[in-house]
Amino acid sequence: MGVSVKPAARRNARQFALQAIYSWQLSKENVADIEEQFLTAEKYDEEEHHANEPKLQTPETDVAYFRDLFSGVALNHMKLDGKMRPYLSRPLQDLDQMELALLRMSIYEMMNRDDVPYKVVINEAIELAKVFAAEDSHKFVNGVLDKAAPTLRKK
């Protein structure tokens, strides 16, 4: 068996990955450059952020998981878009950028991380949507992922 990772460390990794994916979608900067910014920059201005927010380069965050999610989404975004398209109630280009980032990350996680139960992926996506996306985005994200899960995880 591998080393056990705390759920909070994965949660923090998802949060940072979501922010990195969102940044990449908007800026189209090089993936390695964005990853480097997240790994080295002091992102938290004390006046704007709470001192208890997680930092990326600490034991509280699974950095390998962050890297997997971020680079996996960036490298496979077209494939991921194709996987989610049948479950969307509106065209892909009409999605909010945060919803798109969250759906891409969650679909990637369902397809590539068999070590994470799909219900955990969906629940984590809902919680991230409540924090980072528009008011009712969590309902939309839940609906898409709930419909997609059976085909992405054949169990």
UniProtKB/Swiss-Prot annotation:
Gene Ontology CC: cytosol
GO molecular function, one term: RNA binding
Pfam family for this entry, one: NusB
SS bonds (residue pairs): none
Superkingdom as given in the UniProt entry: Bacteria
Secretion signal, residue range per the UniProt entry: none
GO biological process: DNA-templated transcription termination; transcription antitermination
Keywords: RNA-binding, Transcription, Transcription antitermination, Transcription regulation
Gene3D superfamilies recorded: NusB-like
NCBIfam families: nusB (TIGR01951)
Protein family (similarity comment): Belongs to the NusB family.
Function per UniProt: Involved in transcription antitermination. Required for transcription of ribosomal RNA (rRNA) genes. Binds specifically to the boxA antiterminator sequence of the ribosomal RNA (rrn) operons.
Protein's recorded name: Transcription antitermination protein NusB
Source organism of the structure: Aliivibrio fischeri (strain ATCC 700601 / ES114) (Vibrio fischeri)
